């Protein structure tokens, strides 16, 4: 492992804690919390909660990934990297970019369109049902009758899909780096 000096125990612990924090947060938000929430509250409550939590989530990811990249970069100068370390550095960098795209662009754009959709849905008595499969025909009818709603829905799903893709790419990057870190531990 190419390094410019050995990291202190504090730096090692910080690096491990930050990576673990970002990975655990991604697991919780991406694979658990949303599915539990959508099955327990109305669609509009779900959207409102997500609109408040996601900015915090994306900025925590951005900060955590940036700290991980910075710590890794300090102890792995570019001139001394082998190909494994180059891949790790690239994965940290990609994770930062993905979190940044979500925090600055995809998340806010999806939220903005969702809030417009919710206003239109309220006017038509939709959004108070629990779960996604409730009253599908009402949403289909609204899409067919209201071009503004249809446009915002299309834009929302585009940004939501891009946000999910960025989130999964970032999760993959951090997972690979966490696995690599675990495989290189001296002991547990």
From Swiss-Prot:
Compartment(s): Membrane
Gene Ontology cellular-component terms listed: membrane
Its membrane topology: Multi-pass membrane protein
Spans through the membrane: 18-38, 54-74, 86-106, 168-188
Main location: membrane
Entry annotated with the keyword Iron-sulfur: no
Sorted UniProt keywords: Membrane, Transmembrane, Transmembrane helix
Family, as annotated: Belongs to the TMEM205 family.
Protein name: Transmembrane protein 205
Source organism of the structure: Danio rerio
């Amino acid at each position: 492992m190419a390094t410019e000096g050995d990291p202190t125990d504090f730096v090692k612990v910080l690096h491990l804690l930050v990576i673990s924090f970002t990975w655990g947060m991604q697991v919780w938000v991406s694979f658990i919390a949303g599915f539990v929430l959508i099955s327990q509250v109305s669609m509009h409550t779900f959207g409102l909660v997500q609109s408040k939590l996601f900015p915090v989530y994306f900025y925590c990811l951005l900060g955590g990934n940036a700290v991980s990249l910075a710590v890794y970069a300090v102890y792995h100068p570019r001139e001394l990297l082998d190909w494994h370390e180059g891949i790790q550095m690239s994965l940290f960098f990609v994770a930062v970019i993905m979190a940044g795209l979500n925090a600055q662009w995809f998340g806010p754009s999806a939220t903005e369109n969702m809030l417009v959709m919710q206003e239109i849905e309220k006017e038509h008595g939709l959004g108070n049902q629990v779960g996604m499969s409730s009253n599908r025909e009402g949403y289909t009818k609204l899409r067919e009758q209201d071009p503004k709603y249809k446009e915002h829905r299309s834009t929302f799903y585009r940004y939501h899909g891009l946000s999910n893709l960025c989130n999964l790419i970032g999760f993959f990057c951090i997972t690979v780096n966490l696995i690599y870190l675990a495989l290189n531990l001296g002991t547990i």
